From Swiss-Prot:
Pathway: Lipid metabolism; phospholipid metabolism. Belongs to the PlsY family. The chain crosses the membrane at residues 1-21, 64-84, 112-132, 135-155, 156-173. The gene is plsY2. It comes from Moorella thermoacetica (strain ATCC 39073 / JCM 9320). Catalyzes the transfer of an acyl group from acyl-phosphate (acyl-PO(4)) to glycerol-3-phosphate (G3P) to form lysophosphatidic acid (LPA). This enzyme utilizes acyl-phosphate as fatty acyl donor, but not acyl-CoA or acyl-ACP. InterPro entries: G3P_acylTferase_PlsY. Keywords: Cell membrane, Lipid biosynthesis, Lipid metabolism, Membrane, Phospholipid biosynthesis, Phospholipid metabolism, Transferase, Transmembrane, Transmembrane helix. GO terms for biological process: phospholipid biosynthetic process. This is Glycerol-3-phosphate acyltransferase 2. It comes from the Bacteria. GO terms for molecular function: acyl-phosphate glycerol-3-phosphate acyltransferase activity. Its main location: membrane. Its EC number is 2.3.1.275. Pfam families: G3P_acyltransf (PF02660).
């Protein structure tokens, strides 16, 4: 049963929301526009606010659904494994030849279901960084780095702490191109369209 749950979680995560919105509503492949990332930020930049928010919401829902699947079929260990599989699916989608997003929204959705107070404070940190720097990627990196410590602070179960460390590492790892652009001074700021 666990194996089936993990496969289903991966497939849920693999649904390429930004690609589907770009291809079927706007007539282009988001992997060929903007940063090439299949996620909410690139959707915001290439398609606008409403599509960006839709992609953000659906991608977060993938994380929530994975946690609920894990809770329905097992305990905390299956919860974190299913959530991680959804993030892996989002980042390396079987439907896009193992291309995908950065995992921020899917991770946030999983945290919403596991540790909502930690997510709330991580969001406030993300928001502060974005407001002051105007870099969404920097906000995501900082929020990811802080999130595991917020989960510890709010006394969530150890599997959730472990999940958050691994998920944060995945988010930061997937932001490698953004980190290079931040260091080079070529990263797009909030409000700049691609």
């Amino acid at each position: 049963m666990w194996l089936l749950a993990l496969v289903v979680a991966y497939l849920i995560g693999s649904i390429p929301t930004a690609y589907v919105v770009g291809r079927y509503l706007y007539g282009f492949d988001i992997r060929r526009r903007g940063s090439g990332n299949v996620g909410a930020t690139n959707t915001l930049r290439t398609m606008g606010t409403i599509p960006g928010l839709v992609v953000l919401g659906v991608d977060a829902l993938k994380g929530v659904l994975a946690v609920l699947l894990g809770q329905a079929l097992g305990g905390p260990v299956l919860v974190i494994l299913a959530a991680l599989m959804a993030i892996v699916g989002h980042n390396w989608s079987i439907f896009l030849e193992f291309q995908g997003g950065r995992g921020v929204a899917t991770t946030a959705g999983a945290l919403l279901a596991m540790a909502p107070l930690a997510l709330f404070w991580a969001f406030l940190i993300w928001l502060a960084v974005v407001i002051f720097s105007r870099y969404i990627s920097l906000g995501s990196i900082v929020a990811a780095a802080v999130a595991p410590f917020l989960v510890i602070y709010f006394h969530r179960p150890w599997p959730y702490v472990l999940f958050t460390f691994v998920a944060a590492a995945l988010v930061i790892y997937r932001h490698r191109p953004n980190i290079k652009r931040l260091l080079a001074g070529t990263e797009h700021k909030l409000g700049e369209r691609s």
